Amino acid sequence: MAKLSKRQKLIREKVDSTRAYSVDEAVALLAELGQNVKFKESVDVAVNLGVDARKSDQVVRSSTVLPHGTGKTVRVAVFTQGANAEKATAAGADVVGMDDLADEVKKGNMDFDVVIATPDAMRVVGQLGQILGPRGLMPNPKVGTVTADVETAVKNAKAGQVRYRTDKNGIIHAPLGNVEFSAQNIKENLEALVADLKKAKPASSKGVYLKKITISSTMGPGLTIDQGTLSI
């Protein structure tokens, strides 16, 4: 039997897998368990939803602007032209273009994290589906990345908007910040996400919708959150 590392021993000692934690308790515990990690760990959430992800009408796909962002610098590319190109640049977009930007994407030059497109640009972006799709970069109106309001879309992306959809098990995964965030900021980010998830509940979903909420750090364990401690 393999020997447990010091970190694994500490997790076994400190984490009670039979209980649910408040966000304050969970953030404090993740910070304690990550004291010897050599990089800034992210804090992420997994939300188990009461949906059947095999049914197209129960797939939950949306986006949330986290009030305190994710703690990461987000690079934004915008496919548009004319006055909208000027608006996108003024709003803080890192790259703006049309056919010229498409050519860069085809060459593999994709130094950006989010792609936004105006509806008229989709004739160009549509040809890039096989490149952008597998990377999770394909613009989609359901998450606000295909829009005529590029100014708001760019500002939201820069402010820490997270995009998500249920995986095959009906689970949503999203970042909430990092271990240097205060517990209050993590909590408010989580509450904003959960509020939007509730709005996105499919009409055909029956029974308990928010089945389980778990937060974790990059190298840490998953801690179940007591939903009664959230303002949702």
UniProtKB/Swiss-Prot annotation:
It comes from the Bacteria. Pfam families: Ribosomal_L1. PANTHER family: 54S RIBOSOMAL PROTEIN L1, MITOCHONDRIAL, LARGE RIBOSOMAL SUBUNIT PROTEIN UL1M. It comes from Marinobacter nauticus (strain ATCC 700491 / DSM 11845 / VT8) (Marinobacter aquaeolei). This is Large ribosomal subunit protein uL1. The keyword tRNA-binding applies. Keywords: Repressor, Ribonucleoprotein, Ribosomal protein, RNA-binding, rRNA-binding, Translation regulation, tRNA-binding. Signal peptide: none annotated. SUPFAM superfamilies: Ribosomal protein L1 (SSF56808). InterPro entries: Ribosom_uL1_bac-type, Ribosomal_uL1, Ribosomal_uL1-like, Ribosomal_uL1/biogenesis, Ribosomal_uL1_3-a/b-sand, Ribosomal_uL1_CS. GO terms for cellular component: cytosolic large ribosomal subunit. Binds directly to 23S rRNA. The L1 stalk is quite mobile in the ribosome, and is involved in E site tRNA release. One of its GO terms (biological process) is translation. Part of the 50S ribosomal subunit. PROSITE patterns: RIBOSOMAL_L1. Belongs to the universal ribosomal protein uL1 family. GO terms for molecular function: rRNA binding; structural constituent of ribosome; tRNA binding. NCBIfam families: rplA_bact (TIGR01169).
